[in-house]
Swiss-Prot record:
GO biological process: intra-Golgi vesicle-mediated transport; protein transport
Keywords: Golgi apparatus, Membrane, Protein transport, Transport
Functional description taken from the UniProt entry: Acts as a component of the peripheral membrane COG complex that is involved in intra-Golgi protein trafficking. COG is located at the cis-Golgi, and regulates tethering of retrograde intra-Golgi vesicles and possibly a number of other membrane trafficking events.
A family per Pfam: COG6_N
Gene that produces this protein: COG6
Entry GO CC: Golgi membrane; Golgi transport complex
Family affiliation: Belongs to the COG6 family.
Annotated compartments: Golgi apparatus membrane
Protein name, as recorded: Conserved oligomeric Golgi complex subunit 6
Membrane topology qualifier: Peripheral membrane protein
Main location: Golgi
Length: 839
């Protein structure tokens, strides 16, 4: 920096200055008189005394002694020429042509100044125009001089030159920051001098400050040296004393050595103690960086590493409580608890902020530049660490439940907004209630599916998320954390249970059609299963509401048939059925039952896993809609329609006919659904009871028709008499007829009496017996199979008795066989042919 200040030496200073100050030795700008021999001085050119010429306006001699002249311009010319000559001398390796040209130029300039004539000078031209030219020449010369100095690597002080170059380079690089005015600094006038001095002052002040700072840093070192100097000197003296001892034997009673040994042992103990304390400090305390991470750091993996260290400190500090003095352990545990409380609150706030911004965040990167997957991993890890504080963790779950419950409830209710422009609203239609319920349940299922995806994306913990978790947290909360997503989902969905139930219940409670109600039951059951597959627990409120709605629909189905029996059937009881066909209400009722059974069988597999009480067509409900209407309504109505059936056999025949028709209708309609009634013993008893009743009435009808046949043929009296002694059906051979020998003494068995009672009736009725039975009475049975069965059985009984009775008379009156043939004049074949029996 010396050159920066000494640059003023070459400026155009005032001519009143006595002498031009010499530059610093570094520039090596010694005068011609100092550096060159006298022979060279004779070659210097001389400038005219322009001032004297201008003042005296006369011809004056020119002073050729440029070096000794006090004129500023002459001195500048002298130094310029000296510099040029020195440059020429220092570069002898230049080409000869170049040197000759420089010498010619020097000689020409010298001759010009030597041959200078005052008469040719014009003061105004010499002073004014030439002053700028002289300055430019001077600056050019100085610039060349400076370049030569900076590029001269042959100088002795090479390091100083390098440092100078670096200093100038530093100034050039920091020109803008230091607000350096290059033009002002390079100005050769007084303004430049002031600027350079100011720059030097500033640089020296800054350098002085830095030196002072360095010296201040040495103060503690010096103080420590002064403090330890006495001990070091003592050790040095002792060591010199020991080394001066020529013998290797050291006396055992040397107090100094014993003292040194004690100090050495004490020093080792102190080192060990220090090492232990440092280890304890590193293990049970946080450094400044870790404390800053806890206080000011963001929630990331580094933060969790620090929290993990704090938890480990808490877990490992329990041994301090076993010490006699519990202060250290209590203080450490209290400090750790405060840090954990602070971290848990910070994690809690982070989780709340994350939840609020998760839905609205459309960018895959958050404010800290982490990806969405990394953010989710940090979120789960935050939940794991927060689970150690149950109060804050439960508060977080409540916040999440409240936030998401409100969100999904608003979304669900918006589906019913008639003024909504975003989506088509769900409209209740009286013509299609099933579609309305399906839309409601589909909307709920969509919300549950979306919410399940949302919850599982945040709260579904995998083993990978728990691998870096402290053991103390895993032992307490691992099982709980793995099921937190389902628990949270069920808590959130509870907000939809009442709103969903209200909108479905208004349809279920007022729907009367059992088929529609059954479709509603199927729909509710289907979505209940779908909800459970999405993670909704079977004991949650929304599932319980769906079950209650199912029960309401099932009760409405059963109630419909009960109401039908109470209302419709009561109107039918006032009219008796003259055609002996089943009443119309029974046919309609069975049609409705069959329609229900048909649609039920299609979905019967869906109820296999349900309990008996929850089934729609359980044994209890089947008894209600099948057995009870028959017992309590149908049979009572038939008894009411034929009040004389017990006294009048024809009335009884009509009653049996309509009963057979009714039970045959019931059996035929229920027979395709035997599998439905075979689910348990109680249900199976219903169909068995119907079949038994039909058989019972058929048997009664058969007995009654046989009685009618025997009465019409006149054989009824003899049938009773013969069967009283020995059943006709039991007669197998001729010996069995001996059982009837006692009948000879009975007057009714006399042939004349038999002729009187049987012959005319038999001959009159037998030809028309088949037509009478089939046409007049059995024609009213709706089942041809039952009618044929009764008819065939009646005539078989009649044919059997006629054949046995004829043989019995022959056996009783073997001598009157012709008379017997006259009374019972139809042979067996003829008799069978007339009544339509085929053998």
């Amino acid at each position: 920096m010396d050159f920066v200040v000494d640059y003023q030496t070459y400026a155009m200073a005032d001519t009143a200055a006595p002498e031009l100050p010499e530059p610093e030795p570094r520039l090596n700008l010694t005068s011609d008189a100092q550096s060159q021999p006298t022979g060279i001085l004779d070659l210097q050119f001389k400038l005219p005394d322009l001032q004297r010429y201008s003042n005296n306006n006369a011809t004056l001699p020119v002073d050729n002694d440029g070096a000794g002249s006090k004129d500023l311009h002459k001195k500048m010319t002298h130094y310029a020429m000296s510099s040029i000559d020195k440059i020429q001398l220092s570069n002898p390796s230049k080409q000869l042509g170049q040197n000759s040209q420089d010498e010619k130029l020097s000689q020409q300039e010298s001759q010009n100044f030597t041959n200078y004539e005052p008469k040719n000078l014009d003061l105004s031209k010499l002073v004014s125009p030439s002053s700028g030219s002289n300055k430019n020449t001077t600056n050019l010369v100085l610039s060349n001089k400076l370049s030569k100095i900076l590029n001269n690597y042959t100088l002795i002080n090479y390091q100083a030159t390098v440092q100078l170059r670096k200093s100038l380079k530093v100034l050039e690089e920091n020109k803008e920051r230091l607000s350096l005015d290059e033009q002002k600094l390079m100005n050769p006038e007084y303004v430049g001098t002031l600027a350079r001095r100011a720059l030097r002052t500033d640089l020296e002040s800054q350098l002085l400050k830095e030196h002072i700072t360095v010296l201040e840093e040495f103060k503690p070192i010096i103080r420590r040296i002064k403090r330890l100097s006495s001990s070091v000197e003592k050790i040095q003296r002792t060591s010199e004393k020991l080394l001066s001892n020529e013998t290797n034997e050291v006396p055992t009673n040397n107090v100094v050595l014993q003292e040194i040994d004690q100090y050495r042992l004490k020093a080792e103990q102190l080192k060990l103690k220090k090492k232990i304390l440092l280890s304890i400090r590193d293990r049970f305390t946080l450094n400044q960086v870790e404390d800053d991470v806890i206080t000011n750091g963001t929630i990331d993996n580094i933060f969790f590493e620090v929290v993990k260290k704090v938890i480990n400190i808490k877990d490992e500090s329990s041994f301090l409580l076993t010490l006699p003095n519990l202060n250290a352990g209590n203080a450490l545990i209290m400090g750790v608890n405060e840090i954990l409380e602070k971290t848990n609150k910070k994690i809690f706030n982070y989780l709340i902020d994350f939840l609020y911004s998760f839905e609205s965040s459309s960018n895959l990167l958050n404010d800290h530049g982490t990806t969405e997957q990394e953010s989710l991993n940090i979120f789960r890890k935050s939940l794991v660490f927060l689970s150690s504080d149950l109060e804050l963790f439960n508060e977080l779950l409540k916040r999440v439940t409240t936030l998401r419950s409100k969100s999904i409830l608003d979304e669900f209710l918006s589906q019913f907004d008639m003024n909504s422009t975003t989506s088509k609203p769900i409209i209740l239609s009286a013509h299609d209630p099933i579609r309305y319920i399906g839309d409601v349940l589909a909307s709920v299922h969509s919300i549950i599916a979306n919410e399940a995806d949302f919850v599982k994306s945040l709260f579904d913990f995998q083993d990978e998320d728990l691998k870096d978790t402290p053991i103390s947290i895993l032992q307490q909360n691992k099982t709980f954390l793995k099921g937190i997503d389902n628990k949270l989902l069920n808590d959130i969905i509870q907000s939809l249970s009442n709103s969903c139930r209200i909108r479905i219940e208004q349809i279920v409670r007022f729907e009367e059609n059992p088929i529609i109600n059954f479709e509603i039951v199927r729909l509710l059951k289907l979505y209940r299963v779908m909800f459970e597959r999405k993670g909704i627990q079977d004991d949650s409120s929304i599932i319980n509401n769906l079950k209650s709605l199912e029960d309401i629909s099932k009760n409405r189905i059963i109630g419909y048939y009960e109401d039908y029996m109470k209302q419709t059937v009561m109107a039918e009881t006032k009219n008796s059925s003259d055609d002996l066909l089943p009443p119309e209400w029974l046919s309609e009722y069975m049609n409705k039952l069959v329609e229900l059974f048909e649609i039920y069988e299609k979905t019967h597999a869906a109820e296999d896993e349900e309990s008996e009480d929850n089934k729609l067509l359980s044994s209890k409900n089947l008894q209600t809609i099948v057995e009870q209407p028959i017992k309590d309504v149908l049979l009572k109505q038939l008894q009411t329609s034929f009040p004389l059936a017990k006294k009048n056999e024809k009335e009884k025949a009509s009653l049996l006919t309509i009963e057979i028709n009714c039970f045959d209708l019931i059996k035929s309609r229920l027979q395709p659904f035997e599998g439905l009634f075979a689910q348990d013993d109680d249900s199976r008893k219903i169909t068995i009871w119907v079949c038994d009743k039909l058989k019972e009435y058929t048997k009664q009808m058969l007995t009654l028709q046989i009685k009618f046949l025997f009465e019409n043929t006149g054989l009824d009296l003899y049938s009773n008499l013969v069967n009283m002694i020995f059943p006709v059906d039991s007669v197998k051979d001729e010996l069995d007829y001996d059982m009837y020998l006692a009948l000879r003494d009975n007057s009714l068995m006399e042939l004349d009496m038999v002729r009187k009672n049987v012959h005319d009736k038999l001959n009159y009725y037998l030809p028309q017996a088949l037509t009478d039975v089939q046409g007049n009475l059995l024609f009213k049975l709706t089942s041809p199979m039952i009618a044929d069965e009764i008819c065939d059985e009646c005539f078989k009984k009649l044919s059997l008795f006629y054949n046995i009775f004829r043989k019995l008379l022959i056996h009783l009156y073997p001598n009157k066989k012709d008379q017997v043939f006259e009374i019972l004049n139809f042979s067996t074949d003829e008799f069978d042919m007339l009544i339509g029996i085929d053998h």
